[in-house]
């Protein structure tokens, strides 16, 4: 049987590194279909830190796509597992037959599914991508994204799968010793990416709660984002006093990020799509409820796991937040499907499906 090839077709260092390390540590030892990768980006020590994997790096999207298409044409039994799919040339190859549906398996990351960019080239490309998506052999995604995808592509097979968020299961009870009282601290957004719509989120928090809370905005990723960070800072200072606004412009190490989250009482995410599942997982693990946009279908996954969900359209005050905290504290976090290690079973099944080992 031909070994499955995994494709990270865009240079997204943080996510790509997370996927590679997860496969190296959790999957490669038990499945030959978890070892072969094609990745856009620089090695930057990844080969050394993932010795169980065979990783081929490419300088750009085009060169990777050309190599993948050549492999697909040379051997029609070759199957590919695309993790996120932000590579237009690969979509066009699926649409034109360069890669066959039986060769194309896609794990939706969220941003690669939705059509939110307003640029002309995106608006021209979206209809073509939509046509190509009808030809995918199988999609893997969160419950909410599967529901969203099925509305336009009901005939494409869908399987539940969660991004392998880096988590320490021993911390599932870490919120139990935390006393929450006094001024609330609210985390706004999951990164410095513009998709977080930080300014609108800050306005929404201020409209609901005024300058009575502290807002923390993590913007250390992506790099070279200084102009936008300053734009958010100035807008924030028009709403909140300096002592109540904390803009984090430096990327935090994982342990420092966990410590930051533990200081928060609420996460506030205004984006109208599924994204930031890693931050959501870490907040929930710490006993911190989240406010989501109703257009973000991840609320379906949260309610399926009996987790409290607040919406941006709901009334928001301290009593409501404290009640959500109490509800979250009563949940057995060891049973949450999108937590580590529970998502591992989904990955093992996904590998078997993509490799053709199970129907």
Swiss-Prot record:
Q: How does it sit in the membrane?
A: Peripheral membrane protein
The family classification in the record reads: Belongs to the glycosyltransferase 56 family.
Q: What is this protein called?
A: TDP-N-acetylfucosamine:lipid II N-acetylfucosaminyltransferase
Q: Return one GO MF term.
A: 4-acetamido-4,6-dideoxy-D-galactose transferase activity
Query: EC number(s)?
Result: 2.4.1.325
Q: What does this protein do?
A: Catalyzes the synthesis of Und-PP-GlcNAc-ManNAcA-Fuc4NAc (Lipid III), the third lipid-linked intermediate involved in ECA synthesis.
**GO CC, one annotated term:** plasma membrane
Q: Which UniProt keywords apply?
A: Cell inner membrane, Cell membrane, Glycosyltransferase, Membrane, Transferase
One matching Pfam family: Glyco_transf_56
Keyword Transcription assigned: no
Pathway entry: Bacterial outer membrane biogenesis; enterobacterial common antigen biosynthesis
For this protein, what reaction is catalysed?
A: beta-D-ManNAcA-(1->4)-alpha-D-GlcNAc-di-trans,octa-cis-undecaprenyl diphosphate + dTDP-4-acetamido-4,6-dideoxy-alpha-D-galactose = alpha-D-FucNAc4-(1->4)-beta-D-ManNAcA-(1->4)-D-GlcNAc-undecaprenyl diphosphate + dTDP + H(+)
- Source organism: Escherichia coli (strain SE11)
Listed InterPro entries: WecF
Q: Where does this protein reside within or beyond the cell?
A: Cell inner membrane
One GO biological process term: fucosylation
Q: What class of enzyme is it?
A: transferase
